[in-house]
Amino acid sequence: MEPVWPLLLLLAPLPWGEGGTPVKPLPYQDLPTLGLTLPGVVRAVYLGNGHIEAAHVVLETQARNPEGLLRLAQQAVEEAWRARPSLAEVDLSLYGAPYRAEDLPLLTASVPQGRAREFLALREPRRYDRLWLNPGKTGFLPPEPVLEDKPHPEGPESFRAKERATQLLQSRTGPRPGVIYHGDPGRPFAALTFDDAPHPLFTPLLLDLLARSGVKATFFVIGRNAEAYPYFVRDLVAAGHELGNHTYHHVRLPKLPPEEVRRELLLCNQVLAAITGTTPRYFRPPGGRYSPEVLRIARELGLATVFWTDDPGDYAGLAPGVLERRLEAHLRPGGIVLLHDNVVGTLEVLPFFLRKAKERGLVLGPVGALPLARR
């Protein structure tokens, strides 16, 4: 059969941005703070989703023994609830001093209000299932602030042209194995996806909103985040959501040698398999930046590479009304919506978006349901 690329290229959209496109930083998010007096507080913030509030307390400490870290975490939990009794959950991240965001924490914990008494009575940290102790891992790459805009194929022009044509073809006929740009435009179903999970402040609030609506989604998980907050990964799975691979360190893959690309994907797979017992089926490259080598390695690891049709720019600090208009304008059968797990704007517009999809008769769900959607 003759290839259809030349015909499709006549109809293809303008070329996507190339590798030189500047990286857009996450905007500063001015969150309300808790007035904690405990020494070593780096940040103590809280946030609500219209139904519940959660807090995230970050501390730096010279302590290294598990019992000392636990005592500090317990003091922080007590102070947080004294400062704001309405909190439904307090989440903690304890780092070695001096604090560096690129390090893995020494200890993390999640304390729902209903388990506060249990947590405060602990004498041994390993007896609490929503606590993680760093086993001594160091030397991690800092995560890059690579934010998704639109897919960026990098490589020969023939490869970029082929990918543009594939994108256009799928927008008319639906997804194909291996690389997914679009769902079936003839089915009243769209995929809802969140990148950069899990986050100790935002993930519990997102889970609560999705549970209230009965909607399932795909969360593309950063391996180092999953390693430090495994209980949130378990929460996602227990709630019926799907997990995808978003690399271990969240770095641009095309610039890496093939063995490092493979390592990024393998490490994330291994972390998720250790936590959940299952290896993910889907992968999304950070920033949507990929090359023939990235696709080949993902395919060899049994991962389908997933892109998106709709990115409203929730990371850009836009007003809720702007995000709502963008989401509504692009809501369509077969769409793949990209939002982020760590942005205030996502929490603000998600209820509106879920309601609009229902009004239009569109079912929202995980990527894995795209080929299975039926009228």
Question: Locations of the language-model features?
Answer:
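Sec-dependent N-terminal signal peptides
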Residues: 5-13
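N-proximal, solvent-exposed amphipathic alpha-helical segments enriched in charged/polar residues
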Residues: 14-52
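N-terminal pre-catalytic segment of deacetylase/amide-hydrolase enzymes
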Residues: 18, 89-192, 199-204, 353-356, ...
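Acidic/histidine-rich, surface-exposed loop or edge segments in extracytoplasmic proteins
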Residues: 49-64, 187-194, 249
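Short, non-transmembrane amphipathic alpha-helical segments
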Residues: 68-86
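Surface-exposed patches in mature extracellular/periplasmic domains of secreted proteins
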Residues: 84-96, 218-222, 279-285, 367
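Active-site beta->alpha N-cap acidic-glycine motif
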Residues: 155-252, 256, 260, 264, ...
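Catalytic domains of cell-wall/extracellular-matrix polysaccharide-remodeling enzymes
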Residues: 227-231, 235, 251-375
